[in-house]
Amino acid sequence: MITTNEIRRSFLEYFEKNGHRIVPSAPLVPQNDPTLMFVNAGMVPFKNTFTGLESRPYKTATSSQKCVRAGGKHNDLDNVGYTARHHTFFEMLGNFSFGDYFKERVIELAWGLITKEWGLDPERLCVTVYHTDEEAFNLWRKIAGLPEDRIIKIATSDNFWSMGDTGPCGPCSEIFYDHGPEIPGGPPGSPDEDGDRFVEIWNLVFMQYEQVNAETRLNLPRPSIDTGMGLERIASVLQGVHDNYDTDTFKALIAASGELTHTATDGQFKASHRVIADHLRAAGFLVADGVLPANEGRGYVLRRIMRRAMRHAHLIGAKEPLMYRLVPALLSEMGMAYPELVRAKALIEETLRLEETRFRQTLANGLKILEDETQHLKSGDTLPGAVAFRLYDTYGFPYDLTADALRARNLTVDQAGFDAAMAEQRKAARAAWKGSGEKASDEIWFDIADQLGGTEFTGYTAEKGSGQIIALIKDGKRVETAKQGDDITIITNQTPFYGESGGQKGDIGVITGNNDLKMTVTDTQKPLGRIHAHIAKIEKGEIKIGDDIQLQVDINHRNRLRANHSATHLLHAALRDQLGQHVSQKGSMVSAERLRFDFSHQKALSDQELAAIEAEVNQQILNNSVVTTRLMTPESAVEAGAMALFGEKYGNEVRVLSMGSCLNDQNEESSWSVELCGGTHVSALGQIGLFHIVSETAVSSGIRRIEAVTGEEARLWLVGRDRLLRETASILKAVPEEVPTRTAAILDERRKSERALADAQKALALANANGGQGGNNAAPEKVGAYQFIGQVIEGLDPKALRGLIDENKKIIESGVIALITVNEGRASVAIGVSDSLKDKISAVDLVRKAVETLGGKGGGGRPDMAQGGGPNGNEAAQALEAVKALLEKA
């Protein structure tokens, strides 16, 4: 059997004899690329060569590059140990041409290596090409003699590679190995392509274009080649196994782990041994390349990798620090190819030993407290359940570990007392939950959390992943199974689906599984803040608790959520920048369609302020700076300048999002926005695309609200407004630029016409009051002891009634004037009383009588002038009669 070391060596030697320079692996920490946490692909060290920023003394190269994918978008950490091909550390074999050979030569070299040098059966190989790349399609037929049905055209981005929004790019061609029909799965491009039967072993990237901008792509004057072959994958193929962890290197590390812990390497401990083997490689190489455990950045990623392995070491029963004792096995397998491992042996061992010792301190603290609590007990005694619960609740010391520790001393734990203490805590928590206004039916989540714990969220760096169903809820009750057509809530042990929290709506997507299972996820909630509940409908198939499933987030929906959520952070920073540091977030809502942001401010924002805020946010988007995430304690985060967001609850560890750039008080570049946030975000601000404010309103006293859209929604919103503007311009028979002035002129003419009409109506009413033609019995008449003018006027602006009352008072020196105008069925009434009579007669009393007749309520004013109205304009004449009747009694 060919070993992994022999495969690596034969790959490099093959390309060396074909004119390539063997280039040693670059360190895992990128030397000239601040956008990357770790080198994660073979081409990374050559990036500046491909872009023309640097030159090399050779035109072709080959390498075996160390890579780590445990942070950023290439995060495989959560799947490691549970799948056949996920790793944190891996080696990428590659050959590169910097303007030398192109498609034909790279296909010749690739086919020659895998079929002639390594002897792979051509009948087990198929390739993919980009759907428009006819050149590559024809070359595969010519060079490899592959039939057309094994040259698969793919139209997705899987077969088109780009370095970013701009820069070198081009189509890809991937080589797949067929493990045979006994392995589930279909060829690439088929519905079941995610199965394990067809495995990609080599990706050939044809860099032939320069992406200038979103609309422009030019041919490169010197096309280049970048290829990548995962060493672990090709080793599994050449060694005749279907699982990378069954290859020689991993088998040796796993065997060492089993030997040191005296445990079986399969069965219940299989995944744990695999995690330890993989993470040992990652930790060893990272320390050798200068990364040390820390609470942020690369050091924090290393610490996560280490502690994940150390947790699994504890699970398999390791009583002492294990990881550092596995370093000799790592050097035995990989030290020859990577002498830096040998040089750093002492540092690697000491770093692992110290970190595991510190990590185990939590357990040690718990055991010490347990010893203090049991020193007075004798053989056969029982530890009170309340003590065991305090160990669990306060110190995180599991009940099972307490029981195991006491068993050796012939002591037991009062489990009933422990359960009672646990139940009492649950009761208190549920009472608090009910007191918060939540539905009583939500108690079901406490049962699930108590029995199964929370859901592990893997979606910060992944949109798809595997999971196991641990609970099902249908019609508010837990069930064991569900079938096609059921509306079901699914809880899994882990998920990439974000559950609604912190103002951000939940993810949607698809869940698939065996036997063509398909479920559509329409929402994801997060009850109790730690369970991810997938709200779904079963489109096809059946499910039961314990089923393994695949979860795929709707990437378009997720990306829109990311853009809107990151935009709220930028908006917050812009508001503080433009309005002052008094601005703080008071609430938010982030959906895929839009965002809403509530903030403290005492007055409405001017158009100029809104424009400045919008411009500042869009400038940060155009700058396209990278968004960075650090995991820190809340105290450290606040000390670092992070703002805590309204309504968020923070645990012992928080995510700190930094985005944008600005100059600080020391004239140094710093992040524009630094906030604590648990939501999902873009990786670079340019992914937001565009930001546009659609409204600014008041929520309550001192609280304002901005609603905005981003990306495609912003574009569509602006397109819609542009269409309305053009339609308005067409109606006005003007060009769009003239709409404001033309509209202002029309409104001015309308105001003039309305004033002229009001003046004419007023003049007519006065003429009637003077006994002119067309009068409506409006001449003064005697009512009781008083002079009275009463008139109903159709269509008069109610605002003109008061002035008309004053004009009529000049006609009668002492008396009462009652005027009613009717507009669209509604009546408005005004009554005036001469100054000489206001002590005897109140205009307010008279108006209220008229308003009552008109079907209204109230009415008010002064004794000499009062107004009111009612909906029954057809009762206007009767209202005047009611006023006269009241006046006769006065």
Swiss-Prot record:
Cross-referenced InterPro entries: aa-tRNA-synth_II/BPL/LPL, Ala-tRNA-lgiase_IIc, Ala-tRNA-ligase_IIc_anticod-bd, Ala-tRNA-synth_IIc_core, Ala-tRNA-synth_IIc_N, Ala-tRNA_ligase, Ala_tRNA_ligase_euk/bac, DHHA1_dom
Cofactor note: Binds 1 zinc ion per subunit.
Binding site for Zn(2+): 565, 569, 677, 681
CDD domains the UniProt entry points to: AlaRS_core
Source species, domain of life: Bacteria
Reactions it catalyzes: tRNA(Ala) + L-alanine + ATP = L-alanyl-tRNA(Ala) + AMP + diphosphate
Class of enzymatic activity (EC top level): ligase
Family: Belongs to the class-II aminoacyl-tRNA synthetase family.
NCBIfam families: alaS (TIGR00344)
HAMAP family linked: Ala_tRNA_synth_B
Entry comment, domain topic: Consists of three domains; the N-terminal catalytic domain, the editing domain and the C-terminal C-Ala domain. The editing domain removes incorrectly charged amino acids, while the C-Ala domain, along with tRNA(Ala), serves as a bridge to cooperatively bring together the editing and aminoacylation centers thus stimulating deacylation of misacylated tRNAs.
Protein name: Alanine--tRNA ligase
Lineage: Bacteria, Pseudomonadati, Pseudomonadota, Alphaproteobacteria, Sphingomonadales
Gene of this entry: alaS
